[in-house]
Swiss-Prot record:
Its EC number is 6.3.2.2. It is an enzyme of class 6 (ligase). It catalyses: L-cysteine + L-glutamate + ATP = gamma-L-glutamyl-L-cysteine + ADP + phosphate + H(+). ATP-dependent carboxylate-amine ligase which exhibits weak glutamate--cysteine ligase activity. GO terms for molecular function: ATP binding; glutamate-cysteine ligase activity. Belongs to the glutamate--cysteine ligase type 2 family. YbdK subfamily. This is Putative glutamate--cysteine ligase 2-2. It comes from Legionella pneumophila (strain Paris). PANTHER family: GLUTAMATE--CYSTEINE LIGASE 2-RELATED (PTHR36510:SF1). GO terms for biological process: modified amino acid biosynthetic process. SUPFAM superfamilies: Glutamine synthetase/guanido kinase. It comes from the Bacteria.
């Protein structure tokens, strides 16, 4: 079969998508108002970079393509400013975090686009249950074969990404005792988990065309894998991260993945084999459950190693790529978080323990979401 086209991208160019919670300023619950928000944004600058998601209490911002994490950060701040200004006119708030702590998925409303209606008819309750919030990171690849290699090689590091970004300890009003409960939600979808062990762009093209011919998929979006190729963009897309509480944290995560991807593409240190996926689900569970305090089974070692230690060792290994990309400032900050076993899940638990109020927790999350910006005038505090 002929090859799928793959748009050539600059090596490790970056882009990100961030899904945020739309919050009612009085009750601090999720509120289904993305239709109103999209109408209010109609004539705004960056309008095409702010999008609805499958349920109406979600909103997504998309960066454009960047070479540097700093440039991306500047753009995300501009997008946030537009959301803040618009929210003031319709009395809503926003926050990060992979889950809303006390929302009930049964109360969610599907956004009335043709695509989302079709997905709801296909997946029914799973669609509403997917009212969880993630950061997706795109990494540019020069060729389809590079994209396939990177998709498999990064699988080794998925526990890093989950542990660093974890921000969803509460779900449906309970403490799940997971650092990232969000990362367990999509397992029920078909075509979730990991890409099949396809070793070249030719093999992937053959697989894709078969799945299309059998009417299992219509396009690349029907694959819900943790990491998937995006040939129309010339990227691979990492989909396992919870939405951080701050824009700053989203940049730390992106800067780490960008440098790691450059190391993997330049040095090809990961030997692709089925062994990568023998341990994948267990390692993923360790990160979801225990975060930075989880353990990692590495196939060339006799015993598990702490995820935290593996992250720090990896950062040492890729230092020249970090510095070459100008990401040193962000990785230094990330290192401090890892050494101190601090991710957003730890912070969320700490805030909640202060007085045991979910409403005050969400209010604090809204404040944290604005911590990158100086404009806090519109935020309503709970009484």
């Amino acid at each position: 079969m002929r090859l799928l086209s793959f748009k050539k991208s600059k090596i490790v160019s970056i882009g990100t998508e961030l899904e945020f919670q739309i919050i009612d300023c009085s009750s601090l619950s999720l509120v289904s108002r993305s239709k109103e928000l999209m109408r209010a944004l109609k004539d705004m600058r960056y309008r095409d970079q702010i999008k609805p998601e499958i349920t109406q209490s979600m909103i997504e911002i998309n960066s454009s393509i960047h070479q540097s994490a700093k440039e991306m950060y500047d753009e995300l701040l501009e997008l946030q400013k537009i959301l803040v200004e618009t929210a003031a006119s319709i009395d809503i708030a926003f926050c990060g975090g992979g889950t809303h702590p006390f929302q009930q998925w049964t109360m969610q409303k599907i956004f009335p686009s043709k695509r989302f209606k079709k997905k709801f008819n296909q997946y029914r309750y799973l669609s509403k249950r997917a009212t969880v919030f993630g950061q997706h990171i795109h990494i540019g690849c020069p060729t389809g074969d590079d994209a396939i290699y990177l998709t498999h090689a990064l699988a080794r590091y998925v526990p890093h990404f989950i542990a660093i970004s974890a921000s969803s300890p509460f779900y449906l009003g309970i403490n799940t005792n997971y650092c990232s409960s969000r990362s367990t939600i999509f397992n029920a979808f078909p075509l979730s988990g990991v890409i099949p062990y396809l070793r070249s762009w030719q093999e992937f093209s053959d697989y894709y065309r078969k799945m299309y011919r059998w009417k299992i998929i219509e396009n690349m979006k029907d694959f819900y894998w943790d990491i998937r190729p995006k040939p129309e963009l010339g990227t691979i897309e990492i989909r396992v991260c919870d939405t951080p509480l701050t824009l700053r944290k989203s940049i730390l995560i992106t800067a780490y993945i960008q440098a790691l991807a450059l190391y993997l593409l330049e040095e090809r240190p990961v030997q692709l084999s089925h062994d990568l996926y023998y341990v994948y689900n267990y390692n993923r569970f360790q990160a979801s459950r225990h975060g930075l305090e989880g353990e990692l089974t590495v196939t060339d070692k006799d015993r598990p190693i702490p995820i935290m230690d593996d992250i720090l060792e990896t950062i040492k290994k890729i230092e020249q790529y970090i510095n070459g990309l100008g990401n040193g400032e962000y990785i230094e900050e990330l290192c401090s978080d890892v050494i101190n076993k601090q991710n957003d899940s730890v912070l969320i638990n700490k805030i909640y323990k202060q007085d045991g109020s979910f409403s005050k927790l969400v209010a604090a999350q809204c404040e944290l979401w604005l911590s990158d910006s100086k404009d806090r005038k519109w935020m309503t505090q709970p009484s």
